[in-house]
Amino acid sequence: MASKSGKDVTVKVENTNGRGRSRSRSRSRSRARNKNVKITINSKPGASGGQRRRGKPQSDKRVRSIVKQQLDKSGVTGPKPAIRQRATATLGTIGSNSSGKTELEACILTNPILVKDNTGNNTFGPIVALGAQYSLWRIRFLRIKFTPMVGQSAVTGTVVRASLNPTATPSSTGWSGLGARRHIDIVVGKAATFNLKASDLSGPREGWWLTNTNDSGDSTLGPSIEIHTLGTTMSAYQNGPFTGGLFLCELQAEWEFSGYAANPALLSLEKNRDDDAEVSFDGQQGEPLTMVVAEDSLFNKVATRRSTFTRGIARDGQTKSETIWQVVDTAVSAAETVVPPPFGWLIRGGYWFVKKLAGRTKLRNGKQTSSYVCYASYQDALSDKPAICTGVAANFYAGRTETARANLHFTQMNEPSTGVGETPTAFRMYRAAPDDIVYLRFKPETVNISVSPAARLFLARKYTAHSLKVKGNSGTTRIHCVVKVNDPMWYSPDWEQVAQPGPIPGVSLLGGTTTIGIVTAAYQAHMWGLHIATAFIVQVTKDINPACSTSCVLTKELNDQHLKTVAGQTSFNWSLRAGETYLMMSFGAHTSAVGEWVWNDADISVGYTIYNSPLTPCLLLTEGSFHIVLPAKRGLIPLASTELFTVRDQDSIPQTTEPPAEEDVGDNETEDESDDEDLDHFDLHDSSGSEPEDEDVENNRVTLLNTLVNQGVDLARAAKISKRAYPTLAEKTRRSVFMDSLIAGCGPSSAWSEACKAARKVSFKEPISESRGHAE
């Protein structure tokens, strides 16, 4: 701003909050509300200046410099920049239009830690490095440069529009609505530049934005630049669709940073693309909208590796990750038609935000899939407000959801832990347990059959159609009984929820001669004598109705603790549906050595005894609102006797090679006293009589554990109560000898050594040599 010589230039900046000042209010009160900055510039040069430029007006540049200096001093422009960096970032290519509709080709976020290309090269540049070191950022200017990759005469039918979205929030804006924004139209084949000023990109804090994306979304992301195409891209030379890239997109900008605050983890946020990915959407009325992708897809692999989950076990199995991902679909396809209402517009808009669900793998169209909760904005994802469906998709039914192909460009938006991972000073003790064992907690249900009553469990003796067998590389096992698995949840030996195991290689379910399912886990236990009990957790991939001509039912005689089979009254059919999970059991005899997997292809006979095992509740409790816990292996490996029961709690049991410290004895006594009240409610063990067999003790533990779990007791707590209520003979001997030795004056090390030696003698496991680490 300039003026004539000899006159003043006055700049007045008013920052008024609310309505104008009332005359009745005092002057002091009005000054507290309104902040006015008055700058007066004398445009008449001084003596020294007049000698050099006599009679010439001041330049606009000098006036702007003085105004900016005064505004900075008054504090209305926020903190002073600590560093300024100008850089050019290559963002990737702008693809062609394949549908003729408005397609989103790119969504460019201006936050410096998110300025990366989508080629999977996640090395950081100077802008990302500075963004991870400072808490505030703003942009002085920004240019989006479009370099054509094809000639103007090579393709026809498509126009490109780049527009500014100040809120970086998905919307259902059409082509006309994009024209109402700050935008530029680009002709294919010609270079173009989209210029934006600082006033277009200013943030809510005197023009500044926050860098850490873990903070509120409306003050961190900054504006976004969306690039859309309209019209099918056709090749002028081949008279067919053109599928290549149209432009190379580059971002040129100058960032300013202030407020040093190092967050090193923000350097490694990932950005990549997954072309031609299979995507589907689930959701029923009142439930969150979920995106389902193949478990072996690039997006799911990256998201699984980088996601951070809240520790603990959710009741509904829907533990959400704390890591948020932006998903951009650059291929408008049938995806929007398979979305439950009312969020078809969200998918049609081209991008949304998701969080990964833990332990929610499903079988869909013969493939393992993972689920992600969808959010309509980044702020909704931070505050965990998912998109809630008001109905289901028109073509939706269980296990048969339609999938669509999509080109997914995904960006990791945040990192829950922003510091450098250091060596922990406290370690958690894990018990030594094989990695191949898992525990399945589920609600059993009788499979629908064609005879009455339907709730009764039937065992198949003779098949007439679609005989069920599990086939492996070295044999087959005939299925005698089927139970439907509802609400499955998988746990590790430390009672931490884990994902569903993958298919066992080389093992499948046959219906006659046709493969109809995959086996994800197996159970086999050697019972008394030569008897074995086998079970498979199977996911059926095809609908089938196995038919049996003769059947068996279960009975229990008086004073007999085991089950027996008796002849059934009629034939029956099982009804198995694709996408469902079933527990398929088989019983028989074996002649192989203990520890080897046994294949049993024989029919079950009338009068066969089924001895008590963890499978017994699955045979008896086949309806009701309760859950059963069953151990299983990820391969064809029989369960050892110590793995059959889920109530082992070795964290509180010292190893035989290391004696407990003196304070550990006191802790154990305190735990015993604290558990007295719980044990009184479940006093199922009579210590006054003879010692029960260890196998009966284990069976009683399982029964008590299931009872406690059904009554709402935590799994770990139920396991501890069951273990203390039914100790084995070796455990009783070890504790008795240990306490007697302490009373006799022995030290803790010597007492524990004697106790372990006595326990090994009771269990017939005498070691070859004694441990050298314990003095007698």
Curated annotation (Swiss-Prot):
Annotated region (Disordered), positions in chain: 1-64, 648-698
Q: Where is this region: Core attachment?
A: 401-431
What is the superkingdom listed in this entry's lineage? Viruses
Q: Where is this region: P2 globular domain?
A: 432-648
Compositionally biased spans, kind Acidic residues: 660-680
Note the InterPro entries from the entry: Astro_capsid_N (IPR004337), Astro_capsid_p (IPR022027), Viral_coat (IPR029053)
Question: From start to end residue, where is composition biased (Basic and acidic residues)?
Answer: 1-11
Q: Which GO terms describe its cellular component?
A: host extracellular space; T=3 icosahedral viral capsid
> Could you say which residues are annotated as the site Cleavage?
315-316, 400-401, 431-432, 648-649
Region Acidic: what ranges?
A: 649-776
In which residue ranges is the amino acid composition biased (Basic residues)? 20-36
Keywords linked to the UniProt accession: Capsid protein, Clathrin-mediated endocytosis of virus by host, T=3 icosahedral capsid protein, Viral penetration into host cytoplasm, Virion, Virus endocytosis by host, Virus entry into host cell
A Gene Ontology biological process in which this protein takes part is: clathrin-dependent endocytosis of virus by host cell
Where are the annotated segments for Basic?
1-72
- Keyword Cytoplasm on this protein? no
Region annotated Inner core sits at 73-265
For this protein, the record's Pfam families field holds: Astro_capsid_N, Astro_capsid_p
Q: Tell me which family the UniProt entry assigns to this protein.
A: Belongs to the astroviridae capsid polyprotein family.
Q: Please identify the protein, giving its name as recorded.
A: Capsid polyprotein VP90
| Species in which this protein is naturally found | Porcine astrovirus 1
